[in-house]
Amino acid sequence: MSPPSVLLLHSRIPLQPRPFRMNSRAAPSRVVVCSVASTEGFISAAPILLPDGPWKQVEGGVTAAKGFKAAGIYSGLRAKGEKPDLALVACDVDATVAGAFTTNVVAAAPVLYCKHVLSTSKTGRAVLINAGQANAATGDLGYQDAVDSADAVAKLLNVSTDNILIQSTGVIGQRIKKEALLNSLPRLVGSLSSSVQGANSAAVAITTTDLVSKSIAVQTEIGGVAIRIGGMAKGSGMIHPNMATMLGVLTTDAQVSSDVWREMIRMSVSRSFNQITVDGDTSTNDCVIAMASGLSGLSGIQSLDSIEAQQFQACLDAVMQSLAKSIAWDGEGATCLIEVTVSGANNEAEAAKIARSVASSSLVKAAIFGRDPNWGRIACSVGYSGIQFDANRLDISLGVIPLMKNGQPLPFDRLTASKYLKDAGDAHGTVNIDISVGSGGGNGKAWGCDLSYKYVEINAEYTT
C-alpha cells in the first residue's frame, strides 16, 4: 500500500487567539469550533471544516466510537512546561487496524516498527504517541526504544505486544526519553477514559509547533445503524505530500474486514492528508493509524462495491479531509487556508496532482501572504504540474473573481481581488482558487496556506 509522511517538535508558543470565519463565498462545509475542556490552558482547538453530507458532528474525538478510550498526560518528554506530551488511544476489543506511513526513505523508528507490526497482524489494541523526540535517524537503539515502549504498554493492558502501535513526533535525531516515558505509562493507562476530556487531552498531547489541537467526531447512519468515526491529528510544519508532516489516529465502531479497511484508509489518505502542503518538506515520521472496533452492531462491510461501503467511505473521506484542512489552516506562520479546486481533468488522480502543484507553489503562497492577486503564478504552477492539458481550455478564478477563461486573461479589479486576499488573512479564513482544465470528469482538491515571515522565524529558531 502506498502511504504518507510526518513531523517535528518545537517548544510551546503562546497561543494568539485567531478569529475565524469563512469568506462570503458559499463553501460546501460547516465550520465548528471545538472546545478543549481542561486542556485549553495549554492550547485551543482548531476550527473543523466539515464537508456537507449525510452525517453530523458529535462530541468525543477518538473516544466517540464505541469501545475506545484515550488519555494525554505530561511525562517530562517536552523540554519545558507541563503541556501534555504522551497520549494513548486504546480499544476494549481487538480492533481491525490499518495504517499509512511516510514515503521518506529515512523513516523514523516508530514508522518502521508499525509497518512491521501491520505486516504480521490484522488487529490492534492501542496506539501510544509521544511528543518531544521524533526518534528518527536514531539507528538500532531508536528502534529498540519503540519495541520496549510497545512491550511496556502491552504488559499494562494485558495484551500482545504486536497489538500496540507507536507514533513519535519531535526533533529528528533524538531518541525518546525512554526512562521518563516508561515511568509515566502506569499513570497514562490509569487515566484512560471514554470521555470527551480523555479525547481532548490526547489530541493536545500529540501537538508540537501546532497552535491548535485537531480533533473531530462524526456520526452517520448506514443500513439503519448509527456509526461513529472519530479522529485526531497533529501537524503544522514539515507538511507536504506524500502525507504531509503529520500524525493521525482514526477510530470507528464500524465492522470492516481487514483488506477492505486498509484499502479504505489508503483511498481516504490520498484524498486528504496527501493533498495538504505547508512547506514542501516530507517528514520522517508521518503516520496514520486507524482502528475499527466493530461494536456498532452493523453487519461487517466485506466489499468496497457495496452501498454500505460507499456510504462509509464518503464519511471517512469527510473526517480525514476535515483534519487535513485543520492542519493546513494551522500551518506555521500562516494567516489563511488556501483551498485549490480543480475540475475538467481526465481523472481524479490528474486533478489532484494539478491541485497539489498550485497549493505547493512558494510563489503562489507568498503572493497570497502579500495580498497580491498575481494570477500568473497560479497559471504557471498549473502548467508545470506534469499533467498534459489544452492551455486554451484553462480557466482560473480567485474566489468569485474570474481571472482567466479559455486560456485568455480577463480584466479584473485588482483592488477588489487584493481586498479578498486581505479579508481572508485578517480573519484567518479561506482563499479559494478554482481551476478548470477541460471537460473531463476528473475533480480534485488540495489545501495549503500562505508563506509568511513568521514561518522562517519559527523554523530558524526550532532547536535553539
Curated annotation (Swiss-Prot):
Binding site for substrate: T208, K234, T245, E332, N459, T464
GO cellular component: chloroplast
Active-site residue numbers: T245
Pathway: Amino-acid biosynthesis; L-arginine biosynthesis; L-ornithine and N-acetyl-L-glutamate from L-glutamate and N(2)-acetyl-L-ornithine (cyclic): step 1/1; Amino-acid biosynthesis; L-arginine biosynthesis; N(2)-acetyl-L-ornithine from L-glutamate: step 1/4
The protein's enzyme class: transferase
UniProt keyword annotation of GTP-binding present: no
Family matches, as Pfam families: ArgJ
One BP term from GO: ornithine biosynthetic process
Site (Cleavage): A244, T245
Localization per Swiss-Prot or TrEMBL: Plastid, Chloroplast
Catalysed reactions listed for this entry: N(2)-acetyl-L-ornithine + L-glutamate = N-acetyl-L-glutamate + L-ornithine; L-glutamate + acetyl-CoA = N-acetyl-L-glutamate + CoA + H(+)
Site (Involved in the stabilization of negative charge on the oxyanion by the formation of the oxyanion hole): T169, G170
The entry's keywords: Acyltransferase, Amino-acid biosynthesis, Arginine biosynthesis, Autocatalytic cleavage, Chloroplast, Multifunctional enzyme, Plastid, Transferase
Keyword Transport belongs to the record: no
NCBIfam families xrefs: ArgJ, PRK05388.1
Family the UniProt entry places it in: Belongs to the ArgJ family.
Other noteworthy facts: This protein may be expected to contain an N-terminal transit peptide but none has been predicted.
Reported function: Catalyzes two activities which are involved in the cyclic version of arginine biosynthesis: the synthesis of acetylglutamate from glutamate and acetyl-CoA, and of ornithine by transacetylation between acetylornithine and glutamate.
UniProt cross-references to PANTHER family, sorted A to Z: ARGININE BIOSYNTHESIS BIFUNCTIONAL PROTEIN ARGJ, ARGININE BIOSYNTHESIS BIFUNCTIONAL PROTEIN ARGJ, MITOCHONDRIAL
HAMAP family attached to this UniProt entry: ArgJ
Oligomer and partners: Heterodimer of an alpha and a beta chain.
Protein name: Arginine biosynthesis bifunctional protein ArgJ, chloroplastic
UniProt organism field: Zea mays (Maize)
